[in-house]
Amino acid sequence: MQLTNDKLPDNPEELKAIILCKDEHITILEEQIRVLKKAIFGRKSEKHSVDEEGSRQLHLFNEAEVLVEQEAQKKLVIPEHTRQKPKRKPLPKELPRVEVIHDIDESERVCQCGAELSRIGEEVCEKLDIIPAKIRVIRHIRPKYACRSCEGVESDGPTVKIAPPPPQIIPKGIATPGLVAHIAVSKYADALPLYRQEKIFSRYGIELNRSTMAGWMVKAAECCAPLMELVYKELHSGPLVNVDETPLQVLNEPGRANTTKSYMWVFHGGPPDKPVILFRYSQTRSGEVPREVLAGYGGYCQTDAFSGYDALEVANPGIILVGCFAHVRRNFVKIIDARGRAARNKPGSPEVALEYISRLYKIEKIARERQLLPDEIVSLRSQHAMPVLKEFKAWMDKRIGQTPPKGLLGQALNYALTQWPKLIRYLENGHITPDNNAAENAIRPFVIGRKNFLFAGHPNGANAAATLYSLIETAKACGLQAYQYLRLLFEKIPHAQSERDYKSLLPQNLTPEQLSQFIASA
């Protein structure tokens, strides 16, 4: 409310109160302006770590969208030092070798004394070569048979016999499993949109329309539907599921404008040594999505503070929600960014909070370096992290009573204290980390791809993308090469009939050696 002279009180104490209130409001507005300027013009990376050496993971705390922008902005800064010549890594032994001999002329193999020179060794220099993609046509020939003696009649059975066509991932199309796998990996693993792939094929003299390739992706994903049911079960088989979501624009959704925002969800779970990464397309950010995916699951679920996740514990008492220290830290970093230049180098409450978080991550670094087992990690945290957390909590309890609630510091403190019961649950299990980075890292390939293809042209395409991202990222997490896995999968899944057949095609049940042998024999 704007005050005029005739409405101002005469009491000096009331005037002082008005000035203080206005001053607080101005401070909040200035913070908001600086944060907006930082978002538009400033760098996206978080460089406010109190102790860089002790907090390696803290630089992973940005959301996936910000991390993608940060990767594009990185600059290499090399401090002064005595430069050592880097050693070149040897080329992989499994690559085929082609030998080219560079020998002297036979007339030069004579010594000055007249004797013939003997070969005493050789110098070998290996250089890397590449042959562009090899495209071939596979002709499927099915001989026809008929009796020339009686020529048969239809009532006695078929007059012409021919072998049935083999099951194919694209039954009536020209695409082989290898081609479908190549297109899928190029789009979903390498972020190469179909319109660019169309141009690449055109350079080889092959006319493949992008709409045709999009249809192949949908058909391939539909063929993998029974396999995805097993992927959902595998997701529930571990002690922890990390969840995150990111916007996706999908065109031609029934009853919705093309500008309406949809979402791609990601779930990271399954056995710790053979993780599952599951993508799920939805028109909504409602908590109904994680409730459906995690129905029947019992264990920890780590998320950010989005309110849609709160109903998980209510709908499923077996789920225990865990908070994310990444978001806590990000709120305090935002305060430093919002300071004016005069106050930027003056340590204050944000630096104190970041120091506490840095100490927590030093403990996590020790656990990684010692390669501790989950039970040993719990013991280490109980001994060293718990005292830090108690001290951090006591400091915040005291500080929040002295801080305006609407300012950035008040918001950061309130966020941390509200989430505190969930934040400290990582102490209970050695498989849990203090942050939700597993989900944010899992969703990053999709975010990179979205920057190139921008939107999905149809809900069927969005569902297909979710399926293929799930299979590719799960294969990568299990140590498999994405193309090799999809090539084998698309070759064998049309023949699968039982649950046992489908289960054998899960990334968790395959090894790199099996894939290499299959590709070599294909």
What does each model-identified segment do?
Residues 2, 108, 142-146, 151-522:
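Catalytic center-proximal scaffold of phosphoryl-transfer enzymes
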